[in-house]
Amino acid sequence: MIAARLSARQPASIKFHFPYPTGGHCDDACNWEANDKHSTTLISEDAQSAVLKRTLDATTYYVTISWEGPAKLSEKSANYFVLTPTDSIFTFTCQFTPQVSASPILTFTEVQQVSSGHWKNYWTQGAVADFSQCTDVRAKELERRVVLSQYLLAIQCAGSTPPQETGLTYNSWFGKFHLEMIWWHQAQFALWGHPELLDRTLSWYETVEPIARQIAERQGFKGIRWMKMTDPSGLEAPSKVGSFLIWQQPHLIYLAELLYRANPSEELLRSEER
């Protein structure tokens, strides 16, 4: 969501410029020279909203843009659209979905209210570092870094799937999840008093369990063998060594234990037994 007060002398516009992925191991993931390999199509538009259809190889998703105030959406070139407001105050929201949204997306004000409530709960209902009584001259900077890390981990590593190794900051390891790293990214949620954020991701393990059982069977093992480098589908990413690594295997057990310590209930035990 974005809200801005605009100048008539310097009108601002919002660019929607879509790249093709590089497929690189470690880069910004943006290939701006491959417009022939993907497309962006305006499939609907009215005075206050528009829907773009994105197609990359076998993947399709939709970008819904909604704005308040007069504005014009124009196509500048392939995969490049610009939204230009004509009023002095302008707000808009943007939503990315696998299908066309069946209901209107939230307005700027609605997103602002939800976001404000979320962060108020995050900072007041969990733990936070306080080194104000420390006499070491480094204490203030250390506290700043700890609190900043709590924020950065919350915005990048608390989704419905495991985060990639560098979160949303950068594209590394082809943008894949590395399940041995999920402990470092997410164990801290339960320890800071936010077990619900950890639980949000752990449900992903249930959806990919059948694939993990197939991996174990293929390799001659009983039970489950969690994939090392993967994506939302749970399939193994190509790797010379990834399929043979085992350091990601115990993480789910320990993370489930953290959830139980935060909420020792029979219901949680039954859900984890599944």
Residue ranges and their predicted role:
Residues E273-R274:
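Conserved small/polar residues in nucleotide/adenosyl-binding loops
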Residues V128-D136, N171-K176, P238-S243, L258-R270:
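The substrate-binding groove and active-site-proximal loops of carbohydrate-active enzymes
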Residues R144, K176-W183, A190-G193, S243-H251:
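Aromatic- and histidine-enriched alpha-helix N-cap/loop-to-helix transition segments
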Residues M1-K176, P195, Y205-R213:
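Acidic/polar, glycine-enriched structural segments that form the non-catalytic walls/loops
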Residues P162-G175, W226-G242:
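Acidic/His metal-coordination segments adjacent to aromatic residues that form catalytic metal sites
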Residues V128, Y151-A154, W184-L197, H251-S265:
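Well-ordered alpha-helical scaffold segments within catalytic/enzyme domains
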Residues L179-I224:
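Carboxylate/His-rich catalytic cores and anion/metal-binding grooves
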Residues Q219-K222, L245-L258:
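Core alpha/beta catalytic barrel or barrel-like domain that forms the active/cofactor pocket
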